Structures are given as structure tokens and as C-alpha cells.
């Protein structure tokens, strides 16, 4: 998968034979002409053909559109659930953010390109251990935002009370991305905590899971419920 990413980035930089970039220097617009030599085009074309073939490879099928949503969405449920499976019991729950999911997966065949569209970042899966107070801050973060992708528990918010399966645990193991683990999207409760890296990119985990499943039937399951609101 690393080789695919490298080729993808290389071809992105040299994807057009002719192009014009307008550069603004503060006083005038400067037109810069970029023209790729035909010899270079001949060199990269075979790579592009192979890359297109790989990116358009069908790896699974979904019976419905997978989209983001609040309080939950099929796309978030799908990615959190498969990531928790990938952790093989090392984590109690999984948490991501809607902002990190960049596209939908439409009903029908799923290609590798579709997964790159959803997850274009090189985010790695990590596990962080939170104490009870920090965990409650995480629950409040999710509910205050009207819902963010998570799995491994049900969350019920009723008035000022937030309940989940792990409220009484002294330590809760949270699976997330290294970006969020470093405080991304205001997840400050993760900052400074030890990160147990699983050694796998989130995008690769999604692709591997899809390759193992002929058909995906993803449902909404009321994993986040707001009562009396």
C-alpha cells in the first residue's frame, strides 16, 4: 500500500501535460507556464495505467450509502466498528471525528479509490488509556457536539447525566488516530498521554476489512441516545 501512495502522489504532481499557475506577488499576477517534457510523460504513463487499475479495483459492495451523520452515521459506525475489530481486544472503545471523513461511500461497488476519497490522510491507529475523569470528558465532548463517530459502547445522555458501559472502569482504553491523539479537533483530553501505536494506517485498515467482506450491510443502531432533550 505504501508504494501505491507514493506513486499516487508522484502522478498527482505530474498529471497534466500543460498547465498554468497564477502566482500573486503582492502587486501583480505572474503567469507561470509548466510544461512536462514528452519523454517524462512516456515514463509516467505506464505507472499511471497500473495505478488507475489498482485504484479502480473493486474490493467490496455496500447495500446502502455510507454517510456521516449526527447523532450517528453509517460511515462513522462502519469505520469505528472495523477499527475496533482490528485492535483485536486491545481497546475498549473507538473514537474518531466526522471532520476526518472526507467523502461518502455510495451504494454499490466499493473501490480502493473510494477509500482514498474518504480517508486521504496518513493517519495511524493508536490506543490511549484514560482514567474515569478523562473518559467522562470524552463522553461530554461527543454529546456536546451532537455526536461523533464511536463504537464499543452505548452512550445515553439524560439531562446532565451521561451513561456508558465503562463509566465505573478505572481505566478505559481508547482507540483513535494519531492526529486526534495529539489533540486534533480540540480533543485536548488526549494530549500528553502515552500512545500505543498499532502500526497500521486507518486507511489500510479500511481497505483490508473491505477486501475480507464481500458485502457490507451497515445499520444505524442508536448507539447514542439523547433523552428529555
Describe the function of each predicted region.
Residues 2-10:
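Sec-dependent signal peptide recognition
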Residues 14-15:
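C-terminal motif of bacterial Sec signal peptides marking the signal peptidase cleavage site
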Residues 19-30, 77-80, 84-93, 97-229:
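Feature captures C-terminal
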Residues 24-45:
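Post-signal peptide N-terminal segment of mature Sec-exported envelope proteins
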Residues 38-61:
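Post-signal-peptide N-terminal segment of Sec-exported extracytoplasmic proteins
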Residues 54-67, 185-190:
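Acidic/histidine-rich, surface-exposed loop or edge segments in extracytoplasmic proteins
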Residues 68, 73-74:
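A conserved active-site cap/scaffold subdomain adjacent to cofactor or substrate pockets
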Amino acid at each position: 500500500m505504501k508504494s501505491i501512495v507514493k506513486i499516487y502522489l508522484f502522478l498527482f504532481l505530474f498529471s497534466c501535460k500543460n498547465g498554468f499557475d497564477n502566482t500573486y506577488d503582492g502587486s501583480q499576477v505572474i503567469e507561470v507556464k509548466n510544461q512536462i517534457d514528452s519523454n517524462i510523460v512516456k515514463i509516467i504513463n505506464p505507472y499511471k495505467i497500473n495505478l488507475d487499475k489498482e485504484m479502480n479495483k473493486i474490493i467490496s459492495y455496500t447495500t446502502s450509502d455510507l454517510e456521516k451523520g449526527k447523532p450517528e452515521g453509517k460511515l462513522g459506525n462502519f469505520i469505528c466498528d472495523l477499527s475496533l475489530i482490528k485492535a483485536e481486544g486491545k481497546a475498549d472503545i473507538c473514537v474518531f471525528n466526522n471532520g476526518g471523513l472526507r467523502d461518502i461511500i455510495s451504494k454499490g461497488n466499493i473501490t480502493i479509490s473510494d477509500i482514498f476519497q474518504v480517508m486521504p490522510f496518513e493517519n495511524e491507529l493508536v490506543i490511549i488509556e484514560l482514567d474515569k475523569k478523562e473518559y467522562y470528558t470524552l463522553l461530554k465532548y461527543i454529546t456536546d457536539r451532537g455526536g461523533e463517530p464511536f463504537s464499543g459502547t452505548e452512550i445515553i445522555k439524560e439531562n446532565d447525566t451521561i451513561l456508558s458501559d465503562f463509566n465505573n472502569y478505572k481505566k478505559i482504553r481508547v482507540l483513535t488516530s494519531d492526529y486526534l491523539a495529539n489533540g486534533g479537533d480540540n480533543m485536548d483530553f488526549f494530549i500528553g498521554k502515552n500512545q500505543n501505536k498499532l502500526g497500521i494506517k486507518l486507511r489500510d485498515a479500511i481497505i483490508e476489512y473491505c477486501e475480507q467482506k464481500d458485502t457490507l450491510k451497515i445499520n444505524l443502531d442508536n448507539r447514542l441516545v439523547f433523552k428529555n432533550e
